[in-house]
């Protein structure tokens, strides 16, 4: 089944309008594992180090039909996933849903790569604290800050050298050439 970004945004908007469940966005993000992303996800799972996986996630993100752009930077001793909310033309409630979903998705993908022991140290959000702010820390597994200058999820930088559980450098090389051809 191929779903366009527009169709997905309409479905999210409909869900927001029909359900009063403030955790839906987090549950949706947590349900999107790397194995659901075809070659894009398999490439990340196959990389020899987390640093390689992070690099490939950013480089090939267009293959994941993204609703939000991601970037990764190392600042000091921390790895930061940056979530770029560039959908200013969408309703505020839908934008919040997408930010929450993407945050949960990034946490899920890191767990897919390194296991349950890989939790963020802090999540920062550019939006003001929503009414369900207490759920953020519970659902993301870390303290959360609101009113920050950008959306970011922080991890200890030393995890970049860790080997993903399904690492297979030969498969990663082959999958990267397939992704390059897309």
Describe the predicted segments one by one.
Residues 1-80, 132:
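N-terminal low-complexity or simple alpha-helical regulatory segments
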Residues 130-131, 135-182:
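Extended mid-to-C-terminal alpha-helical interaction segments
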Residues 47, 55, 64-99, 108-129, ...:
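Conserved binding/catalytic microenvironments
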Residues 37-44, 86-93, 160-161, 180-181:
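Short hinge/gating elements
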Residues 95-99, 103, 168, 172:
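Short, charged, low-complexity patches
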Residues 12, 54, 103-106, 179:
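Hydrophobic alpha-helical core bundles mediating ligand binding, dimerization, or RNAP-core interactions
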Residues 60, 105-109, 113, 178-181:
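Conserved short hydrophobic interaction patches
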């Amino acid at each position: 089944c191929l779903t366009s970004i527009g169709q997905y945004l309409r479905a999210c908007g409909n869900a927001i309008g029909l359900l009063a469940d403030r955790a839906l966005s987090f549950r949706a993000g947590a349900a999107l594992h790397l194995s659901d992303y075809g070659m894009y996800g398999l490439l990340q799972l196959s990389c020899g180090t987390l640093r390689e996986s992070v690099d490939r996630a950013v480089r090939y993100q267009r293959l994941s039909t993204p609703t939000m752009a991601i970037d990764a930077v190392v600042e000091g001793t921390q790895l930061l996933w940056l979530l770029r909310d560039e959908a200013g033309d969408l309703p505020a409630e839908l934008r919040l849903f997408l930010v929450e979903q993407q945050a949960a998705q990034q946490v899920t993908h890191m767990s897919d790569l390194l296991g349950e022991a890989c939790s963020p140290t802090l999540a920062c959000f550019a939006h003001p604290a929503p009414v369900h702010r207490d759920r953020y820390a519970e659902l993301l597994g870390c303290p959360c800050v609101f009113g920050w200058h950008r959306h970011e999820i922080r991890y200890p930088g030393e995890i970049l050298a860790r080997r993903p559980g399904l690492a297979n450098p030969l498969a990663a090389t082959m999958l990267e050439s397939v992704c390059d051809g897309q």
